[in-house]
């Protein structure tokens, strides 16, 4: 089973940022340190990142992108439809992956059980082995530091990379602005 990964999404005023580390781990071995686990969807209008099984995540990305196309890029309608499809399909219910999807208006976590969760604060979401470290750091920095969104995500992921053995500090970021 692939452990690893920290993905952090942040939605601010007119900006969305997603970041992820680059470490891929199998058991107690680091297989790769510069993997890309984030991407843009729907012609660059949606940011997405995954944690969990890579093969499962690519299946989820493909399925979600088809739904986005069908819903003309409406993120809210797409995550609801995605959840419905996930729960109907027995194969999908066994996938071992989670995703964060966001734009400048919405941010969601899509769980491995087909749940759609909008963060309580509507701003910050984290998944993966270092997710709680990144989430804690991001909340503290958001509340007490005057950082731009991109720097906040990067610094939070660096903190997670220093604490979580399945996360490194080879960070990649994607940004979306209104």
Swiss-Prot record:
Could you say which residues bind Na(+) here? 161, 164, 167
- Any one GO molecular function term: metal ion binding
Q: Which CDD domains match?
A: protease_HslV
PROSITE patterns linked to this entry: PROTEASOME_BETA_2 (PS51476)
Activity-regulation annotation: Allosterically activated by HslU binding.
Question: Family assignment?
Answer: Belongs to the peptidase T1B family. HslV subfamily.
Q: Mind telling me what this protein is named?
A: ATP-dependent protease subunit HslV
Source species: Nitratiruptor sp. (strain SB155-2)
**Gene name for this UniProt entry:** hslV
């Amino acid at each position: 089973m692939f452990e690893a990964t920290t993905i952090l999404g942040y939605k601010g005023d007119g900006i969305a940022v997603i970041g992820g580390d680059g470490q891929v781990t199998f058991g107690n071995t680091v297989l790769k340190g510069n993997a890309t686990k984030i991407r843009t969807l729907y012609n660059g209008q949606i940011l997405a990142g995954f944690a969990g099984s890579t093969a499962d995540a690519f299946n989820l990305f493909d399925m979600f992108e088809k739904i986005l196309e069908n819903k003309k890029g409406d993120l809210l309608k797409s995550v609801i439809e995605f959840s419905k499809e996930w729960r109907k399909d027995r194969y999908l219910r066994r996938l071992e992956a989670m995703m964060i999807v966001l734009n400048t208006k919405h941010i969601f976590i899509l769980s491995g059980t087909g749940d759609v969760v909008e963060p309580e604060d509507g701003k910050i979401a984290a998944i993966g082995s270092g997710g709680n470290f990144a989430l804690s750091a991001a909340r503290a920095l958001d509340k007490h530091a005057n950082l731009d969104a991109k720097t906040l995500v990067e610094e939070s992921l660096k903190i997670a990379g220093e604490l979580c053995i399945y996360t490194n500090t080879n960070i990649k970021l994607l940004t979306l602005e209104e």
